[in-house]
Design a protein with these regions (language model features):
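Short, well-ordered amphipathic alpha-helices
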Residues: 42-43, 69-77, 135-144
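Core AdoMet radical
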Residues: 1-39, 50-66, 79-98, 105-137, ...
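Distinct, well-ordered alpha-helical segments
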Residues: 68-74, 98-104, 167-169
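Conserved C-terminal portion of the radical SAM core fold
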Residues: 109-113, 133-279
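An active-site-proximal structural segment forming one wall of the substrate-binding cleft
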Residues: 45-47
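Generic intrinsically disordered, low-complexity segments enriched for polar/acidic and small residues
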Residues: 14-20, 25, 32, 39, ...
């Protein structure tokens, strides 16, 4: 019987995917506490499952901040369990910890996903507090790692949201000749979902993305465009957004810009020009 671990990380609160009101009120601590260093029951349970675990799924944003996780993984190596264990390791590429990389490299196989959702100043905007220069330096280290440890595949995973949808062709084409590149969707909160965009804006996005010369990108983007055209859940929309989802997009983006001294308009001028008629 295959055991499935899922270990979630901390340090995702400052991205644009964090809920705005949670960010303001700092109400995301409960989820973090479940895998905090002090939650002995959690870590003891993982230790008990360790001898039987065959697949361990470690989600980002940045799991290298969960230091006790690597104590567990080192224990697996010391006990010999690692020889039969496959890991999936999702990182936002903001930290390179050589000690932890050395631990991961000893497992039977590790699938690395580098979660990078924008280029240059777009990245800095979406992942507030992190910088493109640091991510690029770490990305290059992961590329070197992939060339050394062929049994451990390294891929780039682009999470598609309303902040980067207009530019995903450019992001994909930047990475596709360096590492395998694929997409993931930002489903929640609803006001970062590409489903929330106005219909006319969706059409402009479609027209731009379908001009790509990359056959692989065109295959990958087809289900994204289909997803974008789906309707938002009426039940979720009415409950969480009594004034509508799009007004919340404008409100949360504008207020976070003021708080963080950022500018959606200046960072994404081409996209904002399309959105501006609806930005009120």
């Amino acid at each position: 019987m295959k055991d499935w671990w899922e270990v979630f990380d901390k340090n995702n609160a400052d991205s644009r995917y964090a809920d705005y009101d949670d960010y303001i009120n700092r109400t995301f601590g409960t989820g973090r506490a479940s895998y905090d260093d002090g939650n002995e029951q959690f870590w003891q349970s993982l230790n008990q499952w360790l001898p039987h675990a065959q697949y361990i799924d470690i989600y980002g944003a940045e799991p290298t901040l969960i230091h006790r996780l690597f104590d567990i993984l080192q224990h697996s190596i010391d006990s010999g369990y690692h020889k039969n264990q496959t890991l999936h390791f999702n990182t936002n590429c903001t930290i390179w910890n050589q000690t932890y990389i050395d631990i991961l490299s000893q497992f039977k196989q590790v699938y690395f996903d580098l979660s990078i959702d924008g280029l240059y100043n777009h990245y800095d905007y979406i992942r507030n507090g992190e910088t493109w220069d640091v991510v690029l330096a770490n990305f290059n280290k992961y590329k070197e790692f992939a060339n050394t440890y062929y049994q451990h595949p390294v891929s780039v995973c682009i999470t598609v949201s309303m902040f980067n949808i207009y530019y995903i062709d450019e992001i994909f084409e930047y990475f596709e000749n360096q590492l395998n590149t694929h997409f993931n969707m930002a489903h929640m909160p609803l006001h970062v979902s590409i489903k929330a965009l106005p219909t006319q804006v969706k059409q402009r996005i479609r027209e731009k993305l379908l001009q790509s010369k990359s056959e692989k990108f065109l295959r990958e983007v087809a289900p994204i465009l289909s997803y974008m055209d789906e309707e938002l859940s009426i039940q979720q929309t009415n409950y969480h957004y009594p004034n509508g989802v799009w007004p919340e997009v404008v409100r949360s983006t504008t207020e976070l810009d003021q708080l963080r001294k950022q500018s959606f308009k200046d960072t994404f001028p081409e996209f904002f020009a399309i959105l501006e008629p609806y930005w009120n």
